């Protein structure tokens, strides 16, 4: 018993020593330390001494989450006290989460942020369907560097001045009209990073005009607006990275892209059918889009976009992708026969990644069921599985169904790295034939990478027996990450 009492006294004594040492620090330094603690722990420091009573109100960084408070009134009362616009201390970083309750306090709180020189602001409406409006003061914040908004409404301002804003992420944010978004972006003279996740009921045209923008990501997966023609217009000559995942927009206009830019495009051109008739009806839009992407060094193309480009190539000549040195394309096994035609347009390609959306169109259901059954048999040794799958795949007619009639220029002069991004046991004969095609026809190929799974390594090693045109070519087997 005496030992426990002494132990408590030692711990209490150590706490006093720590508090005394902290108290010797300046208020700004204490606030900086407190800003790294959860808000509940920050507030509890107010009971340490008279000096500490109000120090927590001056911390420069805060994460305020409505759900940690017992009720809405407590949450609002805390915020009203902390976001007092008469305080002179700065609020550098703030994350604010709130729910569907009346958010009339937002105006006064945000006005306080702006007055107290906010630098990084993250505001998220977590629950509810009402999109609360943000006040006009946010549009004229002279110190704001990063702005990230979720499920909110931006009103239409007459004037915007955000001279320091470099990062802006707008996730499911509602704009009253097209001009509001365009004015917001164009009024940020040093903006470098822009991310837009578009609402499902937003059918507007997004115009991004910026002389400073370097990174742009736009996601629009669906829409329920049928009386508009959504689109995307990008005029940002300094962009280094552009990712568009858009299943809705019918028009895409890209102006003056940098040649060293990297593009990641998942575009459907507003179509649900990717056959040649559908592509033909959008021919002029596709024709105006392709020259812009043909100028970039790095290009990643989704399966649907690849289909659109292929069917367009049957209607008109594709532009030459002379600057493209890195290509990542996703397709189905049944679409492999289209790949060489596109590679013909990339004469200087150095690196190629082919990712596969799994389909077993060429393999009968009986064969697939037999393979699945064997893979579930715990007592079957790896070699038995290898021998059976090899018999099904390598000795089927599939291995001869893929025929490339030509060798693109890039294989003879520039292609150095190829990766076939799929699990080996999901390969049918066509993918094996593709690996063989690259090995036998690439003059300066340095590395061909495949991804075997647990039972596929022995099977993949058979590819080592294929003839290699490039003497320096390495064959790499590695797990998919």
From Swiss-Prot:
Segments crossing the lipid bilayer: none
Name under which the protein is recorded: Putative F-box/FBD/LRR-repeat protein At5g25850
Residues in FBD domain copies: 401-452
Residue ranges constituting the F-box domain according to the UniProt record: 19-69
Domain of life of the source: Eukaryota
The species this protein was found in: Arabidopsis thaliana
Keywords: Leucine-rich repeat, Repeat
LRR repeat locations: 123-151, 173-198, 328-356
Entry-linked InterPro entries: F-box-like_dom_sf, F-box_AtFBL13-like, F-box_dom, FBD, FBL13/AtMIF1-like, LRR_dom_sf, LRR_FXL15/At3g58940/PEG3-like
Gene3D superfamilies linked: Ribonuclease Inhibitor
Phylogenetic classification of the source organism: Eukaryota, Viridiplantae, Streptophyta, Embryophyta, Tracheophyta
Pfam families (UniProt xref): F-box, FBD, LRR_At5g56370
